[in-house]
Amino acid sequence: YVSGSKGATLVTHAESVALIKKHGRKATPELKTYTPAAGMPTYDTIRAKVVKEYTDAGFSAANVWLQSFNYPDVAYWVKNSGDFGKQAVFLDGNYTDGTTVGMDESVPSKPIGIPNFVAYNAAGFNYIAPPMQMLLKNDNGKLAVSDYAKAAKAAGMHIITWTLERSGPLAK
């Protein structure tokens, strides 16, 4: 929060990467949706710059999981970023219960229920990251592995998740 902090400045992504490296940490940067305007860098330039800033700081790809909800971001990294692409994480914004089967084939980044993990894997995607409710189900009062998680593992996908999805005020 800069507005309320007199004299404060935001760090650049490269400065943030240098701090992470200095403290011996691993990184999971998320590339947000970017809409370039006239005179702004292209989307591919931004995708490449993220990787370059980690390599310039001396990061091994083994310590960086690039992530995005945007299918083309992950596809770009897989195709153009060597070992960094092998660890790129496709964030699944699907918020069903992990049992509904189907996929909007016209929009591969918008799965409905259980995505086509075999196709993701064939495209070079190795990591999927859905919200927690996609990985677990209630099986007669007992916690069980969801169909989504079983399908992802069967296709050879690595799974990373987050524990809290918050789309509105916490008071709700």
Enumerate the language-model features and the residues they cover.
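C-terminal active-site rim and adjoining tail of enzyme catalytic domains
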Residues: 38, 44, 87-172
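Metal-dependent phosphodiesterase/phospholipase catalytic core, i.e.
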Residues: 1-75, 79, 83-96, 123, ...
